[in-house]
Structure formats: C-alpha cells, structure tokens
C-alpha cells in the first residue's frame, strides 16, 4: 500500500492540488484510493471533490470522533465515494480542535497510568479499520500548520 501526505507549514503551496492529482492519477490507473481531508482551515480537498456534506454538523460521525475513541458508527461509514476508485473522508470543523482533544485523551490516559501517543491515532484508526485490505493508496491532505497528525 502506498501512502502520501503532502506536508508544508505554509498554506497555499499546492498540498491539496497534489493530493487531488495523486488520487485521480492512481484511480485512473485502477487503484482503490482513500483520500483523507485533514485540512483544519477550509477542507479544500472536500470542496474539490464536491460531495454533499455538512462539515459543520456537530452530530455527524467524523474522523475526529474516531481518533479520540468516540465513534458514532463504523469507520467505513465515514467514506464517501466521490469518483470511481476514490473514497473520501471529508474534513470536519472538529478538526480545528483535534490537538486539544488528543491532548485531553493523552492526559486522561496518563492519569490512569496508561501510555497514549497523540501522534499514532490516525495509524491506529486506519489499522483497526483494515484499510490495507480495501485500498491500494491512502492520501492525507493536511493543514498548512504543524499539528498532531
């Protein structure tokens, strides 16, 4: 499985364009692609692919809920098929507070004498969902700032 995560702390340098182009190119080559929009600022990858999705609905299940161990449904229900061969996990407004949520989880775990790595939660969620069995390529579109993912 291939994984891409275009990263830069600067905004407007082409991360989303790169992510979308990689997704489309791999899908055209016959690969099954999972694109994950983790852009906290404006969710451009979600807007690029254009699914009907309300990123501001606080009651909808979203990736953040899964990252902090409070899912409201199955992981596969987070995905939206946006083109043949491309499933998208759309951005959600809760991503803006992801660092704080993960820090709270870390502090709570440490209070109980448990270890918790904020920086491994995306890997944990993807592993638990067995994405390797379904997808050939994963592309993560990140925000133009440093963060826990």
List PLM regions with ranges:
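P-loop NTP-binding core
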Residues: 1-149
């Amino acid at each position: 499985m291939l994984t891409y995560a275009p990263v830069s702390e600067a905004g407007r340098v082409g991360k989303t364009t790169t992510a979308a182009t990689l997704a489309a190119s791999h899908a055209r080559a016959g690969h099954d692609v999972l694109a994950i929009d983790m852009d906290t600022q404006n969710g451009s990858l979600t807007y690029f692919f254009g699914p009907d999705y309300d990123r501001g609905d606080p009651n909808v299940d979203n990736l953040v809920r899964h990252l902090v161990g409070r899912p409201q449904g199955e992981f596969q229900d987070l995905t939206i098929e946006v083109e043949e061969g491309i499933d998208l996990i759309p951005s959600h407004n809760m991503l803006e507070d992801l660092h704080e949520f993960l820090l709270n989880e870390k502090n709570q775990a440490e209070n109980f004498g448990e270890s918790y790595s904020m920086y491994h939660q995306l890997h944990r969620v993807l592993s638990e969902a067995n994405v390797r069995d379904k997808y050939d390529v994963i592309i993560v579109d990140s925000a133009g700032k440093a963060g826990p993912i």
